[in-house]
Swiss-Prot record:
GO terms, molecular function: holo-[acyl-carrier-protein] synthase activity; magnesium ion binding
Keyword terms of this UniProt record: Cytoplasm, Fatty acid biosynthesis, Fatty acid metabolism, Lipid biosynthesis, Lipid metabolism, Magnesium, Metal-binding, Transferase
Reported function: Transfers the 4'-phosphopantetheine moiety from coenzyme A to a Ser of acyl-carrier-protein.
Protein name as catalogued: Holo-[acyl-carrier-protein] synthase
Taxonomic placement: Bacteria, Pseudomonadati, Pseudomonadota, Gammaproteobacteria, Alteromonadales
GO biological process, any: fatty acid biosynthetic process
Enzyme class, UniProt record, top EC level: transferase
Cofactors, names only: Mg(2+)
Length: 127
């Protein structure tokens, strides 16, 4: 096994709150998959949830070496949780193609937040 990609992103939660106050759910609908959007809508702290998912997807795009764009969309990166609450990451479409190009087979993700910030790190691994 080898590391083929590493990415980290940090988001100021206040920035997400300001964007949502100005534009409603526009950012959430651009960043989140349908499954993630359903969780966001029902979440007790939706802006914090959105900030963590935004950081996670940006970190994943950095690990892929593309950033968002250039064939990789927010919609191609799916962030979930195990039954125990640990974050999971899954790639589809352009993100999956880029992972295959890197000979990657699996992504590891860590997401954390505190009062003002959300941060995520993604490690991509080959077999």
């Amino acid at each position: 096994m080898a590391i083929v990609g590493l990415g980290t992103d940090i988001v100021k939660i206040e920035r997400i709150e300001a964007h949502v106050a100005r534009s409603g759910d526009k950012l959430a609908r651009r960043v989140l998959t349908e499954a993630e959007l359903a969780i966001y809508i029902a979440h007790s702290q939706p802006n914090r949830y959105l900030a963590k998912r935004f950081a996670a997807k940006e970190a994943a795009a950095k690990a892929l070496g593309t950033g968002i764009g250039r064939g990789v969309s927010f919609q191609h990166i799916h962030i979930g949780n195990t039954p125990d609450g640990a974050p999971t990451i899954r790639f589809t479409d352009g993100a999956q193609q880029r992972l295959a190009f890197l000979n990657g087979v699996f992504g590891h993700i860590s997401i954390a937040d505190e009062k003002s910030y959300a941060i995520a790190t993604v490690i991509l691994e080959s077999c």
